[in-house]
Amino acid sequence: MALRIEDKKAIVAEVAEQVSSALSAAVADYRGLTVNEMTSLRKQARESGVYLRVVRNNLARLAIKGTEFECLADALKGPLVLALSKDEPGAAAKLFKNFQKDHNAFEVKNLAMSGELFGPEKLDDFAKLPTREEALATLLNVMQAPVTKFVRTLNEIPSQAVRVFAAVGDSK
C-alpha cells in the first residue's frame, strides 16, 4: 500500500520526535513472526516503556538524520522493527532479548547508543545495563562506604579505651 506524502511526513516527524528523546535504539528483523506474536511484542514494549515501530527504512533514515542514532542509517536493510528506549538505556535490549528466547524467527540486527553502532553480539551487555534507580543505588553505596568505615573507626576508639580499663581492672 502506497503512502501519501503527508502520511510519510507525519511518520518521519513522529519517529524523529521519539528518537530525539531516546537513550538507546535497537533494530531487529521480524520476518517469520505471526500477527499474534507481533501484537505480543508491542504489548510488552508498551509495558516496559519502549517505543516500538515498524517503519520503512527510508523514512527511518530521514527520522534519524542529524541525531546520535544516525549511525544506524547503513544498518537499515530489509524489514525491520525499530525499538527506542526512553527511560532506561537497556530497556529495548531487554525486550528484544526476552522476546528472542521464545521466537527463533526474531533476529536482532543492531544496537545503538551515544552515536555508536553495535552488533547483535552486544545484546546481552545492553540488556544487563542497570536501570536509573539501580545505578543511583550503586552510586550511593560507593559514596557511603568510606563514610561508614570512618564512623566505625571513630566508634572503635572509645571501645578500645573501655577494654583497656576493663583489662587493667581485671588484673588488679
UniProtKB/Swiss-Prot annotation:
Q: Which Pfam families match?
A: Ribosomal_L10
Q: Which domain of life is it from?
A: Bacteria
An annotated GO cellular component: ribonucleoprotein complex
Q: Which InterPro entries match?
A: Ribosomal_uL10, Ribosomal_uL10-like_sf, Ribosomal_uL10_bac, Ribosomal_uL10_bac_type
Keyword check for ATP-binding, yes or no. no
Alphabetical UniProt keywords: Ribonucleoprotein, Ribosomal protein, RNA-binding, rRNA-binding
Q: Which SUPFAM superfamilies match?
A: Ribosomal protein L10-like (SSF160369)
MF GO annotations: large ribosomal subunit rRNA binding
GO BP: any one term: translation
Q: Provide the family line.
A: Belongs to the universal ribosomal protein uL10 family.
Main function: Forms part of the ribosomal stalk, playing a central role in the interaction of the ribosome with GTP-bound translation factors.
| Subunit-level organization | Part of the ribosomal stalk of the 50S ribosomal subunit. The N-terminus interacts with L11 and the large rRNA to form the base of the stalk. The C-terminus forms an elongated spine to which L12 dimers bind in a sequential fashion forming a multimeric L10(L12)X complex.
- What is the designated name of this protein? Large ribosomal subunit protein uL10
The scientific name of the source species is Francisella tularensis subsp. tularensis (strain SCHU S4 / Schu 4)
